[in-house]
């Protein structure tokens, strides 16, 4: 069976994508090769997932139809140098945060390239990935990229100039939500609940509310209004959140992350 997917880098996000692709049968293990410099990590990936591994990035690039770049941005130039001069022209997909299509294009002239931004829930198959393609990408290649990231959650296609905004919402968003869950649980502890119960209540409340909004397709404000009865407990809590600037704090957090992403992209 021919190699369909090459992954450069065998870190946490790369492994998460690899595991889900195999579990979802998007690719068979024998269709995947991973280029990874560390011997212990190569051994682990080979034994755990039965994929082909190699210390040579060029080997992975030369035999793959799709090449997924999953290295740290600070080693990108070195990795691109190791891939230079290959005869093969795979579809290149980059998941490097803050790295533009133009920068990837310098290492892969005349290649179809897709920039992707998955978030950390992808590690459990509940991710949100935004993708942006250059002009060389054909419809069938775009479909392949969407299939890869559909294995780890949901996918949306956006123009590249919106990727910094994506970073502010879904890229950084898991931290905001985690902070809110922690604060909600802390409030429960303050009110007398045992920590374990408070955390379980907070977690399931966030999960359940997100699922409710997703399934009903109602605006979040409609869900809020249904819970807030006149003179009741919920509206009392909502009033405090509004007074303390909860809504504007979230908006400003997104804007700050967006601006920081823009700054990092210029370096």
From Swiss-Prot:
GO BP term, example: L-proline biosynthetic process
One MF annotation (Gene Ontology) recorded for this entry: pyrroline-5-carboxylate reductase activity
Superkingdom of this protein's organism: Bacteria
Gene Ontology terms: cellular component: cytoplasm
Presence of keyword Oxidoreductase: yes
UniProt xrefs under Pfam families: F420_oxidored, P5CR_dimer
Statement: the UniProt record of this protein carries the keyword Cytoplasm: yes
Primary subcellular site in the record, as a coarse category: cytoplasm
Keyword annotations: Amino-acid biosynthesis, Cytoplasm, NADP, Oxidoreductase, Proline biosynthesis
EC numbers: 1.5.1.2
Subcellular compartments: Cytoplasm
Cross-referenced InterPro entries: 6-PGluconate_DH-like_C_sf (IPR008927), NAD(P)-bd_dom_sf (IPR036291), P5C_Rdtase_cat_N (IPR028939), P5CR-like_CS (IPR053790), P5CR_dimer (IPR029036), Pyrroline-COOH_reductase (IPR000304)
Reaction catalysed by this enzyme: L-proline + NADP(+) = (S)-1-pyrroline-5-carboxylate + NADPH + 2 H(+); L-proline + NAD(+) = (S)-1-pyrroline-5-carboxylate + NADH + 2 H(+)
Pathway annotation from the record: Amino-acid biosynthesis; L-proline biosynthesis; L-proline from L-glutamate 5-semialdehyde: step 1/1
PANTHER family listed in its UniProt record: PYRROLINE-5-CARBOXYLATE REDUCTASE (PTHR11645), PYRROLINE-5-CARBOXYLATE REDUCTASE 3 (PTHR11645:SF0)
NCBIfam families: proC (TIGR00112)
Function: Catalyzes the reduction of 1-pyrroline-5-carboxylate (PCA) to L-proline.
Family (UniProt): Belongs to the pyrroline-5-carboxylate reductase family.
Name the record gives this protein: Pyrroline-5-carboxylate reductase
Species: Synechocystis sp. (strain ATCC 27184 / PCC 6803 / Kazusa)
């Amino acid at each position: 069976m021919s190699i369909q997917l090459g992954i450069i880098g065998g870190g946490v996000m790369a492994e998460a994508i690899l595991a889900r692709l195999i579990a979802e049968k998007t690719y068979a293990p024998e269709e995947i090769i991973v280029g990874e410099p560390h011997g212990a990590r190569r051994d682990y990936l080979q034994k755990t997932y039965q994929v082909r591994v190699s210390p040579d990035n060029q080997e992975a690039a030369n035999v793959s139809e799709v090449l997924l770049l999953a290295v740290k941005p600070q080693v990108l130039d070195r990795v691109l140098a190791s891939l230079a001069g290959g005869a093969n022209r795979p579809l290149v997909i980059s998941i490097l945060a803050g790295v533009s299509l133009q920068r990837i294009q310098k290492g892969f002239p005349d290649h179809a390239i897709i920039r992707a931004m998955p978030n950390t829930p992808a590690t459990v198959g509940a991710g949100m990935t935004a993708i942006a393609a250059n002009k060389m990408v054909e419809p069938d290649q775009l479909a392949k990229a969407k299939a890869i990231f559909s294995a780890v959650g949901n996918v949306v296609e956006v123009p590249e100039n919106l990727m910094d905004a994506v970073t502010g919402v879904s890229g950084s968003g898991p931290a905001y939500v985690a902070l809110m869950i922690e604060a909600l649980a802390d409030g429960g502890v303050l009110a007398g609940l045992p920590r374990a119960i408070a955390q379980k209540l907070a977690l399931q409340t966030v999960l359940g509310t997100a699922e409710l909004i997703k399934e009903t397709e109602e605006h979040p404000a409609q869900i809020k209004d249904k819970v807030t009865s006149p003179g009741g407990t919920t509206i009392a809590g909502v009033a405090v959140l509004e007074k303390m600037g909860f809504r504007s704090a979230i908006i400003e957090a997104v804007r700050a992350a967006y601006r920081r992403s823009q700054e990092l992209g210029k370096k």
